[in-house]
From Swiss-Prot:
It is found in: Cell inner membrane. It comes from Escherichia coli (strain K12). PANTHER family: ATP-BINDING CASSETTE, SUB-FAMILY H, MEMBER 1 (PTHR43038), RIBOSOME-ASSOCIATED ATPASE (PTHR43038:SF4). One of its GO terms (cellular component) is cytosolic small ribosomal subunit. ATP 1 binds at G45, P46, D47, G48, V49, G50, K51, S52. The lineage of its organism: Bacteria, Pseudomonadati, Pseudomonadota, Gammaproteobacteria, Enterobacterales. It is a multi-pass membrane protein. This is Ribosome-associated ATPase. It holds the Pfam family ABC_tran.
Amino acid sequence: MTHLELVPVPPVAQLAGVSQHYGKTVALNNITLDIPARCMVGLIGPDGVGKSSLLSLISGARVIEQGNVMVLGGDMRDPKHRRDVCPRIAWMPQGLGKNLYHTLSVYENVDFFARLFGHDKAEREVRINELLTSTGLAPFRDRPAGKLSGGMKQKLGLCCALIHDPELLILDEPTTGVDPLSRSQFWDLIDSIRQRQSNMSVLVATAYMEEAERFDWLVAMNAGEVLATGSAEELRQQTQSATLEEAFINLLPQAQRQAHQAVVIPPYQPENAEIAIEARDLTMRFGSFVAVDHVNFRIPRGEIFGFLGSNGCGKSTTMKMLTGLLPASEGEAWLFGQPVDPKDIDTRRRVGYMSQAFSLYNELTVRQNLELHARLFHIPEAEIPARVAEMSERFKLNDVEDILPESLPLGIRQRLSLAVAVIHRPEMLILDEPTSGVDPVARDMFWQLMVDLSRQDKVTIFISTHFMNEAERCDRISLMHAGKVLASGTPQELVEKRGAASLEEAFIAYLQEAAGQSNEAEAPPVVHDTTHAPRQGFSLRRLFSYSRREALELRRDPVRSTLALMGTVILMLIMGYGISMDVENLRFAVLDRDQTVSSQAWTLNLSGSRYFIEQPPLTSYDELDRRMRAGDITVAIEIPPNFGRDIARGTPVELGVWIDGAMPSRAETVKGYVQAMHQSWLQDVASRQSTPASQSGLMNIETRYRYNPDVKSLPAIVPAVIPLLLMMIPSMLSALSVVREKELGSIINLYVTPTTRSEFLLGKQLPYIALGMLNFFLLCGLSVFVFGVPHKGSFLTLTLAALLYIIIATGMGLLISTFMKSQIAAIFGTAIITLIPATQFSGMIDPVASLEGPGRWIGEVYPTSHFLTIARGTFSKALDLTDLWQLFIPLLIAIPLVMGLSILLLKKQEG
């Protein structure tokens, strides 16, 4: 890298007394630092030392807890300054593609960011074409970002960051997990851009010490504090160290580095050792994707064999196939001469496996973790205490035996995970990137433990890594890329074979050969006028940019869009037919102890009703009890002796009626039906026995039902289900759209771009309003053509009300999303908050006027109550806007209230 001469200009960022906490964890501890401008500044240190927290404060993505942060001449606590400098800062967060949208193409991702920064169509085309050409992504402009390699995602993220020509470029571990070739190309591209845009300041966090050698100025960090600053050469001179990693170790506090010892690796002596692991044409496919492509290797007992490659190249997949955790699609693998068989427990007991995530039980202490794994591997109970004590002593865990793993530093958790993996004394140890993110002292201690296991205990160690200095410690390594093994041998053999100066250069040469590339650097993008236009307060371009992006993602996610439509249809069918107040086809049986014409006439009168179905008669109380228990009948009727005679004499008669009371409301309805049928039969008998003169009365009253003459449930329930589903489904979808961004990390684009909270929420809301209206038309079609419930009133009135109601529903989803951080929580939270008021307090079953207390108040203010009345009014009563206009007023009031509250509660910075 060309080290640019430092020009005496004001610092690009100044921090004074900055502290940051996450719960009880101290991320930054009273940091005071001036970061020079117009140079490449690197923050170095392992994971968890505060690098990302520091960068997020400088970028404005995180709220400042304590202290002052000045960036580009202004205070980052000041919202106005943050808004003003936002177009001058670019932020590329940690994690490959974290700020990208994986269903969008390469072009669409860059275009989205260009729209956010206010570029018009012509300018966007020019800038995007230049960036894609300069980074070599032009041939892949139509490929979805999710299908790019790690290096290509890295370049795409850089394109998105550079689309607005920033003055400050912030890169948070941009090359972690990327292959050496992509890493080298990335930094060459950054160098070229800086040469053309001399006023650009670049701030980088990295865990690679070799990478940090290239930077102009370094900030060494540990435990949230700054250890030292200066160039790499200055840090080496200050600590009298040969390498930057050695300098970093010497800068650590005495208590932390006192246990450090240089790793000593005795030469490996094969001595005709047996083969511990052998793979022949091992292949793994996931659909059409080939994760591992015909891999071959042989590893003798006691060897440290390294798998070197970038994230996603197939290392972890290969290891899982070797341990039997994943069945191979093709090829064969052997452990100690036996074919790999997931069911062969004896062979698997000879293997220890340590995953990237360490696989510890956080609710158990260190000692309990060791004891549990000892029992899982069937170590005799009497031997467990001694074995646990041995592991604690060997891996230096005695002082933390009663502490939970999540409370331990990363390096100690790493040693505990290794102790757990070897507690059953395996003959082979498979380690999947065990040192990722660990500080150099802990990494060297871990390596010394591995070397002792290999050389003293003759344990075969198969380790994957993407650190070059670790690969050089292995007896042999295999260079892997895109599922294929490029070369195998000792590190020295691979370097000599390529005539390279280092293992990294050799790996790059192998990668170039595999890809058919040359060493020609990519052309840097043309630098445009970096004068940033004044930022607009509210931009429809940014709003519609989010709407367009959300619509594209929704269209390309068939599961989400299909469930949104088909889920509504299915729920409508289930609820329309499933929710019914109708009590019909009641099976009854009669215990007739009279057996006269009158008793038979009474029975025929009951069976002639559409509400009752007669079953074979009863003969005894025992049969009555048995058939009612079995659910064969719902109603049992006993007609007493002399029933007909008493009727003829006008003597009062009594019938015995047994009703299944498992459902009280249904039983009450059945009781009313039987009483009504009995009274009707008595009146009919009396009318036949009376004279014509006596039959005439002063008046004759008949009851008629308007709007629903047959008192059927469908005409009442179906129009009520429409508001219920239009509240639940659109609100869930809109809530998930925001929470999904929080989970994936792309919410960072809201924090660090000029987008306002209102632009973000309104932009995301529009596609779901359109989808909600489509759902509305589907539900109306089902109501009319499937359920046979005609719509008699003004459909325009119902459509207008539905539009307002869906705006409220999606707004409620956005409001709920401001409190939720996971999609599962968003689904449950939205379901509870929308379904309970809609079903219990909005008049779906019981009228709002019949409610009391808080339930009545909820029913009066909840939007579903008003839209449900409009839906029933237009469906059943043929009403229009002139009849229903007053019900629109609460809906119109609710929209600004819900949306205003959502915008107010949405955070523009991470808390």
